Amino acid sequence: MNKITPLDVNWCNRPKSIAAALLQSENHAALIDPGPESTLTTLREQLRQHGLSVSDLNAILITHIHLDHAGATGKLIRENPNLKIYVHSKGAPHMADPSKLIASASRLWGDQLPTLFGETLPVPQENLQILEGGETLTLGQRKLEVAYTPGHASHHVSYFDSDEGVAFIGDTGGVRITDGPYILPATPPPDVDLTLWDKSFHTILERKPKSLFLTHFAEYNDPEAHIIEFRERLHRWFNTAEKSLAAATKFVGKTSPPIMQKPEPSATDPAAKEIEAKIETAAMAVFIRECSAELESKVGPAEAEHYAFTAGLDLSFRGLSRAIRKRQEINTR
């Protein structure tokens, strides 16, 4: 008996924001992406409704280590020390010692971090099962293929159940609220890479899944159409961010004092940092305005706010901006 069940963990009292995947087979139960620690009460209740407790789980599979996907893992280990935690090798060190992960999240979320994500605890090294991609996991009567799918994050993997035809792709497929008409890119810093992301799309589609399981939110049953639409929007958003940055750079350069207009200011120059912050702020405002208008036209204001809360348009701009600057640095070497 193999069964796949989406568990809505009701993030910040918002249904259809984060879905953990419960995988059951004979004498085995696993979760893919349990969510943040702040939603553990709901996760426990969801498990209870399916006749399970945390102590009944055998494994947790992490697509990537962002807190909305993996933040609860350390606390779950305290409740069930026998859990096996599957995670990519680039993410594993930050599961064992989440201090840098928490510091990075704090820079993005500030005082909201505890409310949004709760407490992120370390995972003991002995519980970690290190993945690279290419492995086949046996979970009871179920077998899952692991594939490395970077782009959204350098430590991102996807899990493929060929018998059921389901691909669990984390954030590689963006945000689509339960079969909705719009797919929202989620591109937070620090390591968005569209070249790698395109390769990950190919990795997913070449396996010909019947459906995609998105952490945000649940299943979608036309994988090829979803990926084609999402890829087009992802690249278009990249171009929108790039144009916004170029326009802001031109405008801020014209209105800045001469000291800020040095041809090649030092990266540590306070004046250079000030002008860069002005450019980012101006470009972000344009990006958010344009993307919000498109989103609202497709799903309406109320659902647009739900999408934006789940992915964060400001975070998406920051991730794209960082990717653009990286690409520019490579092209000028």
Regions found by a protein language model. Give the residues of each.
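Divalent-metal (often Zn2+) His-rich catalytic cores of metallo-beta-lactamase-fold enzymes
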Residues: 198-251, 267-277
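C-terminal regulatory/interaction regions
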Residues: 243-333
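Metal-dependent catalytic neighborhoods of phosphoester/phosphodiester hydrolases
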Residues: 70-80, 97-98
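Residue-level marker for buried hydrophobic side chains located in beta-strands
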Residues: 30-32, 61, 85, 166-168, ...
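Conserved beta-strand hairpin/beta-sheet module of binuclear metal-dependent hydrolase folds
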Residues: 1-50, 54-56, 159-171
